[in-house]
Amino acid sequence: MKKPILSLLILVFLVINLNAQRKCAVGDASDEKLKRRHEILNTKLQDYYQKYDKQNIFVDNLIRIPVVVHIIHNNTSGKIGGEGNNNISDEQVFSQIRVLNEDYRKKISTPGFNNSPVGTDMNIEFYLADKDPDGNPTLGINRIYSSKSSFDVFDENTLLSSLSYWDSNRYLNIWVTTLKDDFLGYAEFPVGEFDGLELEEVDEAIDGVMIDHRAFGSKTGTSTNGVYTHGRTLTHEIGHWLGLIHTWGDEYCGDDFCNDTPPTESGNLSIKCTPKYSNCRGTRTLNMIENYMDYTADSCMNIFTNDQKSRVRAILEVSKRRKRLITNSEFNLPQTEKLIVKVLENPSSTDYLQFQILLNAFANFNYEIFDASGKQIIQASFEDSPSRLIQIPKIDLGKGIYNLRVKSGEEIVYNRLISQ
Ligand SMILES: [Zn+2]
C-alpha cells in the first residue's frame, strides 16, 4: 500500500524526537577545556611513541577493570526496578556489564562481533567489584536516594560524587541517574605523565562515567524503548574514559588520531544504520558508522579498530590513575594501616615462596632476601605500587633458611623464609 508522504515524514519526525539524538557531553566542542585536554593527551602520546619501541611496550594482556555502579535515584519508597523507576534493578546492571564484555572482547555470536579486518578484540573485561574499599565483600552496586530528580552533567558531577564515590585509583565509578538536557552520558578522560608538560589532572572524585538510566543496560528495566537501549552508550563513554576521541575529532573532518578510522565530517546521528559518506581532504570516503565512538544508534555499532586499541594501550601505560587501577585489580589485595608482610605457607608446598606485601597507599617499596651468612641473594624494587603478591621460584634460592627484608618509606619489616 502506498503511504501518503506527509504521514511518513511525521512518523520519522516523531521517531527521532521520541528517541532523542545521541548526546554525549564529551563531544561538546564549545568546551575549550576538553578540547585542550585532547591536544595535551595527543602530544604526550607522540612523545611516548618516539621514546619507546611500540612493539615492545604493548603487550596484549587481558586487562580486567573493576566497576562500581552508583544508582542515584529519587524513589522515596526505595522500591527497586519497575517502569520508569530510576532505582533500576540489578538485572539492568548485569545486562550492561554483559554488553561491555561482548563489545570490548568482540565476542562471537553477540552484537559486539564484527568481521572487519580492522576490527579488534580490545582484550579488556569489566566486572562488578567484589570487594569494597575496606576489603569487604560487595555486589559492586550502591543505591543512594537523593531528592533531586535529575543532574546536570557539567555542573553537578561533584554533587553526584558527594552522594556516593569509591577511590577512582581502584575502581571505575559509574553514576547511573537521570541526566538533564537529554544527555545520555559523560566521561572523564585519562591523562598521561611526561616530563616538560604541565597537566591538569581531573579531580579524583569525579573521574568516571555519568550515564542516564534509560540508556544504561540492554533491553531491560527502564532501558527498553528507543535506539539507545542496547547498552552501547556505556561502551562509548568508557571509550572516552580509556582515552578515545569521537571518530570525527569533535570538529568538521577532525582527527581522532587513529589511522584506520576514515576521516569523517561529523558525528552520524543515523538511527537506521544507512551508509554515510564524507568529503574530507578532497576524497569521498565511507564513514565508519559502526564504530563505538560515533553517534549512531546502538544497533549500528560493533567495532573498535586496531589503532584505537594501540591508542588505549599506550594511554594505559602512561596514565597514572588508570595504571594504578589495573595493577590493583591484578592483585586485588587490601590496603592496611601500616606495612604488613604476610608469608603464605612457610615452608611452601609449591615451587614458589610467596608473600603478600600490604601497603597503606600506592607506594614505593623494595624487598631483599639474604642467606644465613647475610649475603644478599635477591632484591627488587617497585614504584607507585598497590599491595601485591610476590612469588619467588624456589629454584632461585635453593634449600635453606633465608631472611626477608621489606622496606617502604621509613617502615621496615623482617621475616624468615624457609625453602625446602
Ligand atoms: Zn562521546
Where in the sequence are the language-model features?
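Surface-exposed, proline-anchored Ser/Thr-rich loop/turn motifs
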Residues: Q335-N360, F370-K375, K399, L417-Q420
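A recurrent domain-boundary module in secreted/ectodomain proteins
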Residues: M301-K338
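The catalytic-center signature of Zn2+-dependent metalloproteases
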Residues: G217, G221-N302
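Propeptide-to-catalytic entry region of secreted or membrane-anchored zinc metalloproteases
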Residues: Q21-S168, T178
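Active-site-proximal segment of zinc-dependent metalloprotease catalytic domains
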Residues: F154-H246
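Bacterial Sec-dependent N-terminal signal peptides
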Residues: M1-A29, L100, L389-I392, Y414
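Glycine-centered tight-turn motifs at strand-turn-strand junctions
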Residues: Q354, Q376-L397
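C-terminal tail/sorting-segment detector
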Residues: K3-P4, Q379-E383, K399-Q420
